């Protein structure tokens, strides 16, 4: 089997935050083509009513799987996967879905102070899935859940080159920093794939140094473990497609996609 015969990997997000995962996945799976799908017509997911979002994502994947027949699907969105992951697997049992969930377990293993914060969207914060992760893996820690209404949009603007005021960003991340009994938060879980693009800004504005935990590499490793590696291959050249459900990404977004080796196609 040649690399041209291999099925592509589909990476899905509500916007362009999933590019953080795509970047890592390409490093580990150089023999594969990728399809990046941004449901920008539904962005942001954090404020959606749960039933409506489930229906939207499940229906969208019906179309995507029929058209592209991928090897696996990476759901590079905490909000989507914590809500719809089980339903996607039930609706499409023939497909393998690799999910993105808040990196609470590794945070609990690494913290020295026992104070961990999870910076997420409101949707991820309120999910029972997230609270179950805390109960299962971080019950010995004090975990602060911080649901930002604005950071995903701000990250999209930042990635496109727009300037953000420091005080506005600081207001979003400030609740992550907790002092208790002489201890301080030492790990912040970035529980939205958009947020790692702003990690340098977060580091600069943070009241004190913390470990910002980005799950992208772990997601890519999990995907690699599920994708068969052919014997003898050469890394692929050429651009992969990016699909935006709105059908009309702006110029800055198209330019960004080119920087990631992606060519925008109509949905």
Swiss-Prot record:
Pathway(s) this gene product operates in, as recorded in its UniProt entry: Cell wall biogenesis; peptidoglycan biosynthesis
Recorded superkingdom: Bacteria
GO biological process, one term: regulation of cell shape
One Pfam family from the record: Asp_Glu_race
DNA repair in keyword set: no
Keyword Isomerase listed: yes
Active site: 77 (proton donor/acceptor), 192 (proton donor/acceptor)
Signal peptide: none
Entry binding sites for substrate: 13-14, 45-46, 78-79, 193-194
EC number: 5.1.1.3
Catalytic activity: L-glutamate = D-glutamate
Molecular function terms, GO-annotated: glutamate racemase activity
Record-stated family: Belongs to the aspartate/glutamate racemases family.
HAMAP family: Glu_racemase (MF_00258)
Function: Provides the (R)-glutamate required for cell wall biosynthesis.
Name used for this protein in its record: Glutamate racemase
């Amino acid at each position: 089997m040649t690399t041209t015969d291999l099925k592509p990997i589909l990476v899905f997000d509500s916007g362009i935050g999933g590019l953080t995962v795509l970047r890592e996945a390409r490093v580990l799976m150089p023999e594969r083509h990728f399809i990046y799908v941004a449901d920008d017509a539904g962005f942001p997911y954090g404020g959606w009513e749960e039933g409506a979002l489930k229906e939207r994502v499940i229906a969208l994947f019906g179309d995507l799987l029929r058209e592209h027949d991928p090897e696996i699907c990476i759901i590079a969105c905490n909000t989507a996967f914590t809500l719809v992951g089980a339903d996607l697997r039930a609706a499409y049992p023939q497909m393998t879905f690799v999910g993105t969930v808040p990196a609470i377990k590794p945070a609990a293993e690494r913290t020295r102070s026992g104070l961990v914060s999870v910076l997420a969207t409101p949707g991820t914060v309120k999910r029972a899935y997230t609270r179950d992760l805390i109960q299962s893996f971080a019950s010995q820690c004090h975990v602060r859940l911080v649901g930002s209404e604005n950071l995903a949009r701000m990250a999209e603007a930042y990635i496109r080159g727009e300037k953000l005021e420091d005080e506005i960003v600081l207001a979003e991340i400030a609740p992550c920093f907790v002092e208790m009994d002489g201890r301080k938060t030492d790990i912040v879980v970035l529980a939205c794939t958009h947020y790692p693009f702003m990690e340098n800004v977060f580091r600069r504005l943070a009241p004190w140094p913390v470990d910002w935990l980005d799950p992208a590499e772990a997601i890519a490793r999990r995907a690699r473990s599920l994708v068969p590696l052919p014997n003898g291959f050469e890394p692929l050249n050429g651009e992969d497609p990016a699909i935006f459900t709105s059908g009309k990404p702006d110029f800055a977004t198209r330019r960004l996609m080119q920087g990631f080796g992606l060519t925008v196609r109509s949905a």
